[in-house]
Design a protein with these regions (language model features):
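Hydrophobic transmembrane alpha-helices and their membrane-interface caps
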Residues: 284-333, 700-749, 789, 816-820, ...
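Extracytoplasmic
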Residues: 58, 62, 135-277, 281-282, ...
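Signature of alpha-helical transmembrane segments and their immediate interfacial
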Residues: 1-41, 404, 408-409, 413, ...
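Helix-loop junctions and hydrophobic alpha-helical segments within the transmembrane domains
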Residues: 339-368, 756-779
Length: 833
């Protein structure tokens, strides 16, 4: 025995109170830091870190405005244009505007009207009419709003039954400043190795941003609570729904937090009941639950201590740690009870020593191999998935330490209980498996081959195309709000098409003299201007002139005609609106440039700035895509748009940029396929190597990998057959499945090897293994599968998938390791004859 082993047994067996005091102190320390634990469901946590489209998205967001606004749909019981409804909308709008972080609230009461009655350009310079203006003709206003190319399906539904309010938040300059600092250093890191000073700067910048981001999310969550409280005061007379990215972020965090608390406690209670039924002694319930709690507290505290937020992807890490810790506990408890039944007169401490000695090696390799399975996620290239891999690596390490430090130290202090080893239902089940596979070994093999073929076919049906709306149940506000906005307000998910001027345009242009034209056309407003200063944009801009505007119109009509797109806005929309004022002005470049210069600033901010750069050389088409469309194929849609603009409309490829959250999310989904293939390849190679080290037998290592491959492929195959898409949550299922299957495989092979040495009879060794280690495997699988079935009650669909698929993967791992693996061992005889 090594000096390290002697020291370990000295601490556990002779100084258990000191060991417990030390461990308790550490757990309390981390429990204190758990107060800093936080969740992060922001869009920044759900995108590819080195995505060039993300960099471009942030540039466009800074130039044209952010997607981070709230959208309130308002469906009144009375007529939308009645005085009482307009009064209620005004009161609601004013209350929302009083929120400190709100910059503005845009409603149908605030937008400029130009046909109610018809006005001239000079009228607009003097006064802009709105729905509340005394001069406004209410009948004409109704017609204008319902038929406006700008407002219809943006602020009012086409049937006039519903309106929408856009709540714009003030830009948090500090947040964006810290974000930019961090991103600049991250980008530099991708280009070249950072110097020590730069690494420190990146560390500080990341820490500062994380801290500020946490407070920013907390404020945003409070704002949304305030908005909902204000909305509740107006629900008597109208149906209201809340939408927008900030709301989705906040509600996702609430769902995750709810699942962590409610279902975490529910799973815990269910596991306690199941352990009580199985082991029928209080100590075998209390000890494993204390160890599971200690592991969870340590990990939550550690994440809080290092300010490492949990995302939608990694939100199930506590559940997984519970699985892994409990699995280790069950194997130790079953082994102790076996030894107690065999060595009835043995000393309590000696039984614990034997329990540890016989289980430390397989448990160590189980933990190590499971770590390898989760560490494989690090190669995915997706930040939240990478973080999840690291979290599980640290968490599994802690679970192993807790299992072999806290559990035996507590067990030593308890007086031994007498127990005779007797058969039970579990023994009958595992014995039945052993007898059945001996009689029907060929049928077992054929069955698994059929399952494998079906799994491969199912895997070929796997898709990454999924709808964000499918994350939520139909009765949730997010789901209902998205459906309503899709049906009545022209789509949910933002997509921008940005088109630059061609590269060869940026050269000095001849200024076209426009003298003598002033006498030919009366604009109806004062032309006190300097021609050199004011008559410039149509002559210097590539797009904002009548040579190019028909092309812009054609692009707009193409985008608007796509079945996947709802509301499309562009400079073409704005010019259609202005054309109703004076078509001659819009059709003449010189006067169009004057119009652009002289139009009031609030009109310019509404009609020009969101859709065209200041120099007129870049266009932005804002599109809302129908998120609830079951036929939505993001990648195909983006490729179709790009192909049409380049191949059919003659634009250069470098001119066309697609951006927005739809593009970023699509990039993430597409990378999932690549990372899934890469992840599984890496993990199986690594596990094969770990098996070889653990078993020191290449043939046994190759046999042992088979149940793991089948378990993982079956789960992925089921996902394919059931049309469950690969997304940012379900990508981790394969790694989870492999990690769980590895646990069973290593314990079974180690026990089989021990039993085989007794008489070198393969089938007898298998029967003894089934009746010993098979029991522990069965207990673990049944307990955790039933426990995690509670997650099926969640409102968050990814949590439901996680609970059910995890349970299914455990059952498949158990079946493969208790049936197929023994058959392969007997057939191929890895230990010789």
């Amino acid at each position: 025995m090594s000096s390290l082993s002697r020291f370990y047994f000295y601490l556990i067996l002779q100084k258990p109170r000191s060991t417990l005091l030390l461990l308790t102190s550490l757990i309390l320390l981390f429990a204190w830091h758990s107060l800093d634990f936080r969740l992060d469901a922001s869009s920044d946590s759900l995108v590819l870190e080195n995505d060039q489209d993300l960099k471009f998205y942030r540039v466009i967001e800074k130039q044209y405005g952010s997607d981070d606004f709230l959208f309130i749909t308002y469906t009144p019981d009375a007529d939308l244009f009645s005085e009482e409804v307009k009064k209620d909308i005004r009161i609601l709008s004013d209350k929302l505007a009083e929120i400190e972080t709100v910059k503005s609230v845009v409603t149908i009461l605030d937008v400029p009207l130009i046909e109610s009655p018809p006005v001239t350009l000079s009228d607009i310079q003097e006064k802009v009419l709105t729905l509340e203006s005394e001069e406004t003709d209410q009948k004409l206003a109704r017609q204008e709003l319902l038929n406006s190319p700008l407002y219809t399906n943006l602020l009012i539904s086409s049937d006039g039954s519903m309106t929408a309010m856009q709540v714009n938040f003030k830009r948090d300059d500090r947040y964006h400043e810290l974000l930019e600092q961090r991103n600049q250093l991250r980008e530099l890191k991708l280009q070249r190795p950072l110097s020590p000073d730069e690494r420190q700067q990146l560390k500080v910048a990341s820490h500062q941003f994380d801290l500020y981001s946490a407070s920013f999310q907390a404020r945003q969550s409070e704002d949304i609570i305030t908005v909902r409280r204000i909305m509740d005061e107006h629900r008597e007379n109208a149906g209201l729904f809340l939408g927008g990215l900030p709301m989705i972020t906040s509600d996702s965090i609430d769902y995750i937090r709810h699942d962590l608390m409610t279902f975490g406690i529910g799973v815990l209670v269910f596991l306690i009941i199941l352990l009580g039924v199985i082991f029928q002694q209080l100590r075998w319930v209390v000890l494993p639950m204390l160890c599971c709690a200690a592991s969870g507290v340590f990990m939550v505290g550690f994440l809080g201590w290092v300010n490492w937020p949990v995302t939608v992807v990694s939100s199930n890490f506590i559940s997984l740690m519970l699985i892994i810790t409990l699995s280790l506990m069950v194997h130790l408890m079953v082994r102790y009870r076996e030894l107690q039944a065999i060595h009835i007169t043995a000393d309590h401490s000696e039984l614990i020593r034997q329990m540890i000695s016989s289980k430390v090696q397989p448990s160590f390799f189980t933990a190590l191999t499971t770590i390898v399975a989760f560490a494989s996620l690090i190669v995915s290239g997706i930040r939240p998935v990478i973080d999840f891999g690291w979290m599980m690596t640290i968490g599994i390490s802690m679970s192993f330490i807790i299992a072999f430090a806290l559990f035996p130290a507590m067990l030593v202090l308890l007086s031994p209980t007498q127990r005779t080893f007797k058969g039970d239902m579990t023994s009958a089940i595992t014995s039945y498996f052993a007898q059945t596979i001996q009689r029907f070994d060929k049928r077992v093999f054929i069955t698994f081959m059929i399952v494998s073929v079906l799994s491969v076919i199912g895997m070929s049906k796997l898709s990454v195309e999924n709808r964000f709306i499918d994350y939520y149940k139909e009765h949730t506000e997010i789901y209902q709000g998205m459906i309503l906005i899709d049906e009545k307000m022209g789509g949910t998910t933002p997509l921008d098409v940005v088109i630059d001027a061609p590269a060869d345009f940026f050269q000095e242009e001849e200024v076209v003299e426009e003298e003598g034209l002033l006498d030919d056309l009366d604009l109806g407003f004062d032309l006190d201007l300097d021609l050199d200063e004011d008559a410039g944009i149509t002559s210097t801009s590539y797009w904002f002139n009548n040579n190019r505007l028909p092309e812009v119109k054609a692009i707009h009509q193409y985008l608007d005609g796509l079945p996947e797109t709802g509301k499309v806005l562009s400079i073409s929309t704005s010019l259609d609106l202005l054309r109703s004022l004076d078509e001659d002005v819009v059709m003449d470049d010189f006067f169009l440039s004057i119009l652009y210069k002289r139009v009031p600033e609030d009109i310019k901010q509404s009609l020009f700035q969101p859709y065209m750069s200041e120099d007129g050389n870049q266009l932005r088409f804002t599109i809302r895509v129908y998120e609830s469309d079951p036929n939505l194929k993001r990648e195909a849609l983006l490729e179709k748009i790009k192909h049409h603009l380049v191949s059919e409309m003659g634009l250069a490829e470098e001119q066309v940029h697609l951006t927005g959250m739809l593009v970023l999310y699509n990039n993430l989904l597409q990378s999932l396929f690549k990372s899934q293939i890469l992840t599984i390849s890496v993990v199986f190679i690594a596990i094969l190597f770990m098996f070889f080290i653990s078993f020191r037998n290449l043939k046994m290592a190759c046999l042992a990998i088979v149940p793991n491959i089948i378990a993982a492929s079956t789960v992925l195959g089921i996902m394919g057959w059931l049309r469950i898409p690969l997304d940012i949550m379900t990508i981790t299922i394969a790694a989870i499945c492999i990690g769980i299957a590895v646990d069973d495989t290593i314990h079974y092979v180690h026990r089989f090897t021990e039993e085989f040495k007794k008489d070198r009879n393969y089938w007898d060794a298998i029967k003894r293994s089934h009746n010993s280690i098979g029991r522990a495997m069965y207990y673990t699988t049944i307990t955790i599968t039933l426990g995690f079935s509670i997650l099926a009650l969640s409102n968050f669909i990814p949590s439901i998938y996680f609970g059910l698929l995890t349970g299914f993967s455990m059952i498949m791992a158990l079946l493969a390791n208790l049936t197929l693996l023994p058959v392969l061992i007997v057939w191929l005889k890895p230990h010789g004859r």
